[in-house]
Every structure is written in structure tokens, then in C-alpha cells.
Amino acid sequence: MSIILNNIYLKISLFFLSLIFLIISSISLYISEKLPEAQEIREIELQIPLKIFTSDNKLIGEFGEKRRSAVSFEDIPPYFIKAVLAAEDDNFFNHSGVSYSGLLRSLYRILISGEIQGGGSTITMQVAGNYLTGRDVSLFRKIKDIFLAYRLESIYSKEEIFEFYVNRIFLGNRAYGIASASEVYYGSKIKDLNIAQWAMIAGLPKAPSAMNPLVNPRRALIRRNWILSRMYDLDYIYKEQFDLAIKAPVSASYFGLASQVDAPYLSETIRRFMINEYGLDAYKDGLEVYTTLDSKLQNHAVSALKLGLESYDKRHGFRQPLNLISLFPENFFFQDLSLRLSLIESSNELPVGLSEVPEDQPLELIYEYLNDLVTSDNKFPVLVISVVDQLIALSGDRKIYSLDWPSSLGWARPYINEDQRGPKPKKYSDILKEGDLVWLERDKVNSSLSLTQIPEVQGSIVSIDPNNGGVKALVGGYDFFLSKYDRATQSFPLLGSNFKPFLYATALESGFNASTLINDAPIVFEDKALEDKWRPRNSSGRFYGPTRLREALVQSRNLVSIRLLREVGIDKVRNYSKNFGFQPESLPSDLSLALGTASLSPLKNAAAFSVFANGGKLVEPYFISKIVDRSGEIIFERKEIIPKQTVDPRVAFVIKDILQESAYRGTAKKLSELNRTDFAGKTGTTNEAESTWFTGFNDFLVTSVWVGFDQPKSLGNREFGSTAALPIWLDFMKPLIETLPKNTSLPPPGLVSIKVDKKTGRRSEGTSSSSIFEYFLEESQPD
């Protein structure tokens, strides 16, 4: 009987075992058919953002939803590998893709909770999920991950799987992969971190938000210390290393885009171009754009423009700040702040510096308002609380700042208008009151604070290679994050006297020469186009009589230029201007053209002056030299374009020679500070000084500076191209002067040098000081 029962039990057992095997086999076959190919991982392209670089490989900008930089296994620090193993899968290098003990723990949690939860996955299974099966939490996905893990282990090495893992994982704050995480949280390469920092990053995959050191430093610290303990228990680190790392504070901070060069205006222009050419995929395809920008020139351009605009701004006084009292209910915050301040002062907690306001104060509206304001460089907004003895102000980060009156605030005379200021202040209450919104500036050297203001005046600076049009530096305004409007490429201010060289070049092409006399005398025009009487004058208010064209251009004489335009012909000048890149139909058709009522962007103006710098060739400005895909293959490279000869090289040479003279004794004589004789330049000031210019150049670099307001208004009666724009150009050039080559060009054939009398412009045989040598086109020699 027992034998029969045993046979029955055996048959039943075999049946159920066969049934289980059949079920497992069927499930395996079903899942296998549903599984993606493990080999596809190699073909899956990680989303890598668009990156923009200077010509010397410095990062300008990065655009994309995800910040990611791939890293190879060989470049991963050994202690970081150990930190990841301690946190995620300490048996990774020994198992075949699946941890059975981990799966049992996961199954136990499912039975206890009744819910499908995460956990129990090896690094290999996580790679399968991250790359192939998705992020949903389900039993079916977990089973797929198990099957795929075995396949992955049979195809790839452990090192390759680990590399897949660390380059794909999300680690919070848009950081994907360990290379980006180290830059986001520590501003450093992964190889340059320490054990405590490696452990912190290794703890992020479990909960990139909840255990983020920026969002929740307490939980992040607990997670990090648990990983360090695991590393010590697994003999990954020594006791001394553990003791040192466990005591380390949370040192993570948010490091935004680690651009090495401040060029947001240009990077935004290139971003728009890339989206237009390549679509939205440009944000994730890992394209790298290499520009013509020179990092050294760009950095100098940014600092020179900021300094120049701030200098102008301070010359014209301290503008009355916006007062916020009216925006809030009466005594909404000042009574509360006064109470808080009295408590701080009574306990001697408020030294010259700052103290913190507790979170329980009803000031959230003010904090929100201040934090919504865009900071500028090292300047930040504060709300004035008191100006009785000191300036006491509240910032958006809940800090109270107190500043004594410094002698350096003599500039802060109250602004009345562009030509008038009030009396020199002696204390803060002379210029401020409670509720004022003002800006403080932190000194970059000693971190001291001072009252400042954000300039309303704007400007731009563009520097290009005159021989090929490559843009070497471009700044489109005071601060991109305060105003994204790119004045270097998108604005078209009136040129003022910056147009005169183009007029004089037309005259030389039309038979005039540099010694031709034009009378500098008062004149009234009945100009039908202007529909009024027009009484132009020189900026000096004086008249100089018969004047050689060279002298007229050197000194930027308005009346000579107007008469010259009338003699040459307005239509001829308009048509000839296309040789410098102008659109003739866009130019005014009246005599005001002589004084620069033509408009041109600073970028195009630099290109126009390049015609004088390069011997008469018109170049087309460009930014991009090449575009490289994620594999390093060049998908676009700008071919060398030979510029078209649009102006007689002799004419270009003579105009350049005249503008070189202007640089040491004319309106641009401040250029003599450079101690170089090969630079040429021209100032420009429009009517009422609404736009001011300076464009200076030699054979190798052309730089154009514009200063004005976005909504045109006078810069002031004492402001000219020589006071507002030229100092910016000089500050830009001075650091570069030692490395910039000197001119090598010689007078072109067909140009002759003849001695002439300074007053008459005619040939001179004498040796007196009244004679000079002048260049002439051989067909336009004087009598």
C-alpha cells in the first residue's frame, strides 16, 4: 500500500514539477519575445546637450534639458567605484547579473506590503531598466530586467556595464551621469573629489530629490554616512580614511553652467541658428559648435564694456530708487522690522556686516519680491530699512546688511537730468529713505560692500578679424540676464561721424584728393527733403575756413562734410556705400547723411571699417568655424572665402592713413595712450549725443564700440564718442596691445606721395613747417 501511495505522490510531484517547468518555460518564451535586444545598448545614444566653444576650446554655453558628459571606466576613480558598489551592489563583480538574496528581500517586502516596490536590483538589472525596459515599477518589468541582466552579462564585460550605469543615472538638478553630477554639486571633475564627496554622489541614485544635498542636506548626510560605513565594513577604506570622511561637512553647492567665457549674447545667437538648422534634436544630439571667438578678447570686451557703462552712469549721478512702501499695506513690514532690529541692536548682534532674520517673521512677500529680481555680476538688490546712522537693508536671502558711510560715495550726487546733478551727499539719508529698493556691490578682492546702481545706459562692443570676418569678441549689452536684447547684432543706431570715412572714400573715388580744399564756414540750407531751414555747425561751435579734406576728416568737421556730400552727390554716396555693406535704399536721401543719419548694427559697422583695414575688401562677419557631432566627426566646416575687392586699395589706404592721424592728434587722440602708431580710428556722435561710437583698427583687428540708450535720448551735452565710447575701446585694447601684431601693409601701386602746402593743398617745393607729404592717387595729383 505504501509503495502505491509513494508512486502516486511521485507522479503528482512530477506532474506539478512539469507544470511549473512548463509555466516557467512559457513565461520565459513569452518574455523573451517581448524583450528588446541587449545589443541595442551600444546603439542607444545618450541625450547630450548642445555645447558651444571658443576657437581656443573654452566652453561658452550649453543648451539642453539634461546636463550630461560621458566618462569611460578607466577615468572613474577607484574609490568612487567602491562607493557605488557599497551603495548599490557590493557583489557586482561576482554575480552573473542577478542577486538572489536581493530578489528574496524584494519578494518579502512585496508579501508584507502587498505592493510592488523597487529594490533588489543589481547594477546590471538597473542598466537593463534604465536603457531598455523603462522606469515603471511592476512585476512584469522586474522579470524582464532579470532576463535582460543575464543577456547583458553574456555580451558585455563588468567594466562596460558599470560604465553604462554611471553615464545614464539621474542624480538630481538636471545632472545625468556622474561627470555632470560632480560639476553640478562640486564644480569639479569627478577625479578631483574626495571620498566623502564620492560617497555623497553614490547615494543619489536611490532618491535623487529626497536625498539631494542641496534640497535636503540632513537626509543626504545620513545616506552618505551609511555608504561610508558600508565601505569601511567591506574593507574598501581604512579606519583613518573613514574617520576623516565621516567628519566632513556637506560641502555641496549648486554650480550652474560651468562656462569658461562670458559670451551669452553670442551663444544665444548660435542657439537660435542651430535650432533653425537642426531642429529641437540639436538640444540632445551632442553637437559641439566651435566659434571664431577668442576667449581672451571676449573676456576683456565684457569687462571693458561693464566698466565703461558704469563710469558713464556714475558721472551722471545717483538716480532716485524705486520705493516699495506704496506696494504694501501701511506698516506691513516696517513695524515688524523695527522691532526685530531693536532686539538685534540691544543684544549687540548687528556689527557692520550682516545678521539673519528668522523665518518666522511675516516678510515672505518681500523675500519673494527681492529673489525674483535678477542679480547682476557681483551686485544684488536689497530693501532699505533704515538710514538714520547707517544704511541698514534687507536682502532676499533673509540677511540684514549694515553699512557705514564711505568717502567713496562722492559720485552719488542726486541725478536731475543728463546735464545736472544735485549737491554731494554726506550721509545715506541725503539720497535714500526707508522702503527704497537699491543695489549693493561686493568687492571682488576684499568682499566689502558698497552702494551702487544698475546702469540704464547700454552699449555694445564687437571685434572682428578684418581679413576674413571672423568675430573675435561680441558683447551685446551691459548684462544679458538683465536684458537679452543683443545690441551688437539686433540694434541699428545712427552712426554719427562714424559714417564720414565712407563719404570721404566716395570723394576720393570721384576725383577729389586728401588736399582738396572745402570751405568750413556757416551755411543755411533750404533742404526740401528736410522741409525746413537747416543750420548745421561743428561740435566745437567754431568755423575754420578753407580746409583740406584730410584735416576735415581728422578733426571731424561737420560743415566741410556737408559741403563735400553736396559736391560729390547724395545718390553717388548712397550707391557707393554698398561697397562697405550698406543697403543704399535704407540711407537717407538728404544732406543729413553727411552727419551720420545712416543706421548700421555695430557688427556690420565693424565689417564696414574692415574695408579700410584690409585694403578695400568687403568681408562677411561669421561666428561658426565648424560643427562636430558626438562621435567627433565634422558635419560642417566653413570654407575659406576670398573677400571681394569692392574699394580701390589706394582709396582704402589713404582713408586708413588719415584715420591713423586722427588717432594721435584728432578726435581720437586718446589712442596715443597705446604708444602705437599703426592704429586708426574714428569717433562718432549723433545729434544731441543720442548715439556715440568709436571704431578703431589696424591690419589685424577691427573693434567697434557703441554707447547709448535703448530708447534714444541724449547722453548729455558733455558726452561724445571720445568720452563715452573711446575709453571702452582703450580698456579693451590695452591688455592686448603687447600680443597684437603691428601693421605690415605698404602703400599699394598707383599711389604717390607729394609735398603740399598745409593751407593751400597745392604742391610745395619749400622745406618750411607749413609743408607736409600727402598721398594721392596718381590720376588725382594736385596742381
Question: Model-flagged regions — what are they?
Answer:
Residues F93-L103, Y176-A179, Y238-Q241, L508-K528, ...:
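Short, well-structured active-site flanking segments
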Residues E531-R537, G569-A607, E620-F623:
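Mid-domain, small-residue-enriched loop/turn segments at the edges of structured enzyme/sensor domains
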Residues T291, S295-A304, S311, I344-S376, ...:
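A penicillin-recognizing enzyme superfamily signal
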Residues S69-E74, D419-S429, I454-G459, L482-F502, ...:
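Short active-site loop at a secondary-structure junction
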Residues V84-L85, M231, A301, D389, ...:
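Active-site SXXK
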Residues I112-V137, K191, A258-D262, N467, ...:
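Conserved catalytic neighborhood of penicillin-recognizing serine enzymes
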Residues S25, E115-L394, L564, K578-N579, ...:
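Non-catalytic, structured segments within soluble enzyme domains
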Residues M1-F53, N91, L111, Y312:
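N-terminal type II signal-anchor transmembrane helix
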